[in-house]
């Protein structure tokens, strides 16, 4: 399960090898909350437990780190 490192804050950003058959996306967790964002274009797929304010914060973090996240995605998924 590739984890995206270097993004500040209390969140865990990751995807799984099983995700490589889908368009690029990332899962985000914090405590018992989870959400999934498509990366191209950036958009929320689903959320469980995060409020709108926190989802906006996550979206901003994704925008700032989008290039690094996509590089990690393609590096992992293109090797499969």
Feature map (PLM): residue ranges:
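Short, intrinsically disordered low-complexity segments
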Residues: 2-4, 45, 56-58
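C-terminal structural segments of small proteins and small subunits
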Residues: 51-80
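Negatively charged, low-complexity tracts enriched in Asp/Glu with abundant Ser/Thr
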Residues: 1-11
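Alpha-helical interaction segments
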Residues: 3, 27, 63-64
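A short, structured beta-strand/loop element
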Residues: 14-52
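Generic structural motif recognizing short loop/turn segments at the entrances and edges of beta-strands
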Residues: 9-11, 33-35, 66
């Amino acid at each position: 399960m590739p984890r995206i490192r270097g993004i500040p804050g209390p969140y865990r950003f990751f995807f799984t090898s099983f995700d490589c058959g889908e368009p690029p996306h990332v899962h985000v967790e914090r405590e018992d909350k989870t959400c999934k964002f498509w990366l191209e274009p950036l958009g929320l797929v689903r959320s469980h437990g995060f409020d709108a304010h926190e989802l906006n914060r996550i979206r901003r973090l994704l925008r700032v780190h989008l290039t690094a996240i996509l590089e990690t995605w393609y590096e992992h998924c293109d090797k499969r």
